[in-house]
């Protein structure tokens, strides 16, 4: 009886999700754009004002920037049609795609490539000089749904040093990339993994003292953070959104993303993330 009730509840929630998505406006007057909650929310809103202005001008629509409390909240907001566009991390995109009908359409180009790296850092006083030294130590990650601050560094440690999180070292989820850098610099964690770009930005704006941390290594190149949109937006609006993003040439907008341009992407570009999840035994639909 309990199993039947659970099954009925699952079906009901799925139906509600589908109806909510269907009910979402195909051509909304105000476009709700969610930003990846990997840094301070007010800082993200302020820094992305040029993007908001650019989109309003070129899409001829009002734009509302949204920063959810965490990755899971953003995934659920997209699932229920409460946001129209979202700037995901690769892992959070794959998770969202497994739960909702969305389409990736653009990603940043940096140094001529639509790819990026994670960096693994250590506190200089931790006694950690290489990955193998992390055995028995405290490793800080960002959000569980983060690619560059969880999935990638965890995979690097597994593949290069045969270290399993929660088994060979303590793993602590501190929420954001910034928090990873701060916890490592302050000695609350021996090491941590985060986006190379965000690590460099944290040092540049004085969030951490660079002399308190050292770089242990970098990951390989992975597909950049994707912009995605609801599939049930009107075909005309979807085409316009794609064209506007790929055509962004405003220096201020690009500078805030530390990008040279935006390039078209497809769902298949993120199969490498799905493969990493399989290696770690992750079920994206239940995360």
UniProtKB/Swiss-Prot annotation:
GO-annotated biological processes: transmembrane transport
UniProt KW Transferase keyword: no
Family: Belongs to the phosphate/phosphite/phosphonate binding protein family.
Keyword entries, A-Z: Signal, Transport
Function description: Probably forms part of a binding-protein-dependent phosphite transporter. Required for oxidation of phosphite to phosphate.
Pfam families in the cross-refs: Phosphonate-bd
Organism of this sequence: Stutzerimonas stutzeri (Pseudomonas stutzeri)
Identification of the protein by name: Probable phosphite transport system-binding protein PtxB
Lineage per the UniProt record: Bacteria, Pseudomonadati, Pseudomonadota, Gammaproteobacteria, Pseudomonadales
Domain of life: Bacteria
InterPro entries: PhnD
């Amino acid at each position: 009886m309990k199993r039947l009730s659970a099954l009925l509840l699952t079906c009901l929630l799925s139906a509600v999700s589908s109806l909510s998505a269907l009910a979402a406006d195909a051509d909304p007057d105000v476009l709700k754009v969610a930003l990846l909650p990997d840094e301070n929310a007010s800082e993200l809103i302020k820094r992305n004002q040029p993007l908001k202005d650019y989109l309003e001008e070129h899409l001829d629509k009002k734009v509302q920037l949204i920063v959810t409390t965490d990755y899971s909240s953003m995934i659920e907001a997209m699932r229920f049609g409460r946001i129209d566009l979202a700037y995901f991390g690769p892992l959070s995109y794959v998770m969202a795609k497994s739960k909702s009908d969305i389409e990736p359409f653009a990603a940043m180009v940096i140094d001529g490539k639509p790819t990026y790296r994670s960096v693994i850092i250590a506190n200089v006083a931790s006694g950690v000089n290489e990955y193998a030294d992390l055995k028995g130590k405290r490793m800080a990650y960002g959000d569980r749904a983060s690619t560059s601050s969880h999935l990638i560094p965890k995979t690097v440690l597994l593949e290069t040093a045969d270290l399993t999180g929660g088994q060979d070292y303590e793993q602590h989820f501190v929420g954001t990339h910034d928090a990873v850098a701060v916890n490592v610099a302050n000695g609350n964690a021996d090491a941590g993994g985060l986006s190379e770009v965000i690590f460099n930005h944290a040092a540049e704006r004085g969030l951490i003292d660079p002399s308190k941390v050292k770089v242990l290594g970098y990951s390989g190149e992975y597909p950049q953070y994707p912009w995605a949109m609801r599939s049930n937006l009107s075909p005309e609006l979807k085409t316009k959104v794609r064209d506007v993003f790929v055509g962004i040439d405003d220096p201020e907008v690009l500078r805030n993303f530390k990008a040279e341009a935006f390039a078209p992407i497809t769902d298949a570009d993120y199969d490498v993330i799905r493969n990493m999840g399989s290696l770690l035994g992750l079920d994206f639909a239940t995360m």
